[in-house]
Amino acid sequence: MHAGDDPVFRIRGLTKTYGSGLTEVRALAGVDLDLQEGELIVLLGPSGSGKTTFLNNIGGLDVPTSGELKYRELDLAAADEDRLTQYRRISVGFVFQFYNLIPSLTARENVALITEISRNAMPAEEALGMVHLGARLDHFPAQLSGGEQQRVAIARAIAKRPEVLLCDEPTGALDVQTGIVVLEAIERVNRQLGALTVIITHNAVMADMADRVIRFSDGRVQSIQQNTQRALPSSLKW
């Protein structure tokens, strides 16, 4: 982490509301945060606390109702859809709970879908090697375990060398041992690529592997915990 550098994200008073009048729901209620290059951040909080809305806003999948949201010099709060699409395509990798792989394509081909439309992308083989799937390049999703499919999804997300990697419950559909393998892949990518990595989870044990743990409650940041050192995923117990 480079605390003295300009942040990757500068966030001030970030607010997101859905609906209006009696049906208005405030998903984010004035979030202030700086997110730094190379950090690994774990977001915790109950369902409905604002974690996913926050991730969608910094990922350019949604826009805030009010407040400041800057990625480097780009004002995401004011960007039009074309600029947000360009931002997502170039700068952000997404990993979700469900893998969204194309069944008729091999692991290599699923990753290549991204490399073919990205600038400065790494070869699909290199991305799959980073998640230890070099021996599964030509396997189809149905021939892979759930954990292997999630690692293909991670390889697909990182092949464009994103500055930001956003993970929403990446181990939610996996057993403990498989989940640890997936977390090892995410940690390795964070360390080797230097991507700012944000992980949403309901599993508080993952907090130990983070640089910072940010807890959300009722659309606000409830607390921020700075870890003095990061635990290896293999040491986590849950």
Regions picked out by a protein language model, each given a short descriptive name:
Residues 7-216:
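ABC family nucleotide-binding domain
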Residues 160, 179, 222, 232-233:
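Extended alpha-helical regions
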